[in-house]
UniProtKB/Swiss-Prot annotation:
This is Anthocyanidin 3-O-galactosyltransferase 3GT1. Mostly expressed in leaves and flowers and, to a lower extent, in roots. In flowers, mainly observed in petals, toruses and scapes, and at lower levels in pistils and stamens. Pathway: Pigment biosynthesis; anthocyanin biosynthesis. Optimum temperature is 30 degrees Celsius. Belongs to the UDP-glycosyltransferase family. Its EC number is 2.4.1.115, 2.4.1.294. Flavonoid 3-O-glycosyltransferase involved in the biosynthesis of anthocyanins conferring flower red/pink colors, mainly anthocyanidin 3-O-glycosides. Catalyzes the addition of UDP-sugar to the 3-OH of anthocyanidin, with a preference for UDP-galactose (UDP-Gal) as sugar donor and cyanidin as substrate; able to use delphinidin, pelargonidin, peonidin, malvidin and petunidin as substrates in the presence of UDP-Gal. Can also use UDP-glucose (UDP-Glu) as sugar donor with delphinidin, cyanidin and malvidin as substrates, but not active on pelargonidin, peonidin and petunidin. UDP-alpha-D-glucose binds at A342, Q344, H359, W362, N363, S364, E367, D383. It comes from the Eukaryota. Keywords: Flavonoid biosynthesis, Glycoprotein, Glycosyltransferase, Signal, Transferase. PROSITE patterns: UDPGT (PS00375). The gene is 3GT1. The keyword Glycoprotein applies.
Length: 464
């Protein structure tokens, strides 16, 4: 098949350089680049993102080249602590892609190759306009799930049906008109659809994304078809091509070697610690790169872990241990490990882990499913609420903490339910079922494998 690849193909890649978005897209690009070594992939991201993603340890293929774009942060700017503040600054600077046109031209001049395809994070909706101007395919990648695409694609329908005024207080209303969802709580729609600052750059970006996606040549989704079949069926009727391609790290592509064994750093010794724990007994706690519970909730979660006697591995960045109850670390020292970072996929795959206490970010939920581990969700923003709804009400593989925030009693109840209550057998059986479906999807000639091959054909310029 490689002989049919366009030898001077040049693919522009426009990530959303925050949270795990850019890393997830780069992982996909690396798979494609290894299978199409004659194709150049130009990866446009912020300096901070590039420094992290293109470190020597990452071993990025030589045909993937980084190009820095401004992050939009004014010199001397003092951040307020809002999770999406740096996102809004970047989006304001990028605008509708005007600032990227010069960088794209520079990459064309440097490589001597005209851009023949634009890949982007789906959030970067204006990439569709750039691709249209160049007369080339646009392939957005949704780092979240198909359910998020549905919510943003139908935003106008939702706003028209529900109304935009007096919406506060209606979070618990159940609606049944959104295609693909049998029902959904209004308060669990992603931020920017009905709730939150709808005039913020972030909310406007999501709304424009929903309107722009129909022009895409194909939409690649970080999921597998069997997880949300009703939603996928509806989306396939609305878009030109839907390609669920996960878990893509396990899929072999033509003309490239099989994926190497996963290498990871365990500098804090998480895995040896887990080796000494009983099967399915440990609560692994991690909230991603952007979400951190407020101090009162960190204290409540700590109190629940101590009172319940649950062994736990807690990945806690920025060292907010000052918020723990006095003496907590010493009293729990025999059954806990608290680290600033953990190799999450490997931790979840360890047999000692019995539950994942999470913010319900999409990658975290997907990794937990792939490992067969039930979840306890404490959603914060973005698609977290929607993912928590799916975990508890649709997939039935976990629970949301009572009231959506950590309290001592509510967290103890959730831990008991998932780890020791009779219901834990049902939760574990359900998540094990989805784990098997995920593994099947990446088998030979199965859904995610076929879709990733199709994506390679489109992006790398096979002569179809």
């Amino acid at each position: 098949m490689t002989k049919n690849i366009s030898r001077d193909r040049h693919v522009a890649v426009l990530p959303f350089p925050f949270s795990s978005h850019a890393g997830r897209l780069l992982t996909l690009v690396r798979r494609l680049a290894a299978a199409a070594p004659n194709v150049t992939f130009s990866f446009y991201s912020t300096p901070k993102s590039i420094e992290s993603l293109f470190s020597p340890a990452e071993r990025v293929p030589g045909n993937v080249r980084p190009y820095a774009v401004p992050d939009g942060v004014p010199e001397g700017h003092v951040f307020s602590g809002e999770p999406v503040e740096h996102v809004n600054l970047y989006l304001t600077a990028v605008g509708e892609g005007e600032s990227l046109r010069g960088v794209l031209k520079a990459a064309e001049a440097e490589t001597g190759r005209r851009i023949g395809c634009v890949m982007s994070d789906a959030f970067m909706w204006f990439a569709g306009d750039l691709a249209e101007e160049m007369g080339v395919p646009w392939v957005p990648f949704m780092a979240g799930g198909a359910n998020s695409i549905t919510a943003h694609f139908y935003t106008d329908l939702i706003r028209e049906t529900v109304g935009m005024h007096d919406i506060v207080g209606r979070e618990n209303d159940i609606v049944k008109f959104i295609p693909g969802f049998s029902e959904l709580r209004l308060g669990d729609l992603p931020t920017g659809v009905l709730f939150g600052n709808l005039e913020s750059p972030f909310a406007i970006m999501l709304h424009k994304m929903g309107r722009a996606l129909p022009k895409a040549t194909a939409i690649a989704i970080n999921s597998f078809e069997e997880l949300d079949p009703d939603i996928i069926q509806d989306l396939k009727s609305k878009f030109k091509m839907i390609l669920n391609v996960s878990p893509f790290s396990a899929i072999s592509l033509p003309s490239s070697p099989p994926p190497p064994p996963t290498s990871y750093t365990d500098e804090y010794g998480c895995m040896p610690w887990l080796d000494n724990r009983k099967a399915a007994s440990v609560a692994y706690i991690g909230f991603g790169t952007l979400a951190t519970p407020p101090p009162v909730e960190i204290a409540a979660l700590a109190e629940a872990l101590e009172a319940s006697g649950t062994p736990f591995l807690w990945s806690l960045k920025d060292n907010p241990k000052e918020f723990f109850p006095e003496g907590f670390i010493k009293r729990t020292s025999e059954r806990q490990k608290i680290v600033p970072w953990a190799p999450q996929e490997q931790v979840l795959a360890h047999g000692s882990v019995g539950v994942f206490v999470t913010h319900c970010g999409w990658n975290s939920a997907l990794e937990s499913i792939a490992a067969g581990v039930p979840l306890i969700g404490r959603p914060f923003f973005g698609d977290h609420q929607l993912n928590a709804w799916l975990v508890e009400n649709v997939w039935k593989i976990g629970v949301r903490v009572e009231g959506g925030v950590f309290t001592k009693s509510g967290t103890m109840s959730a831990l008991e339910l998932v780890l020791t209550h009779e219901k834990q057998k049902e939760l574990r059986a359900r998540v094990e079922m989805f784990k098997k479906l995920a593994l099947k999807a990446v088998g030979p000639e199965q859904s995610s494998t076929r879709n990733l091959h199709t994506l390679l054909e489109i992006v790398a310029g096979y002569n179809l």
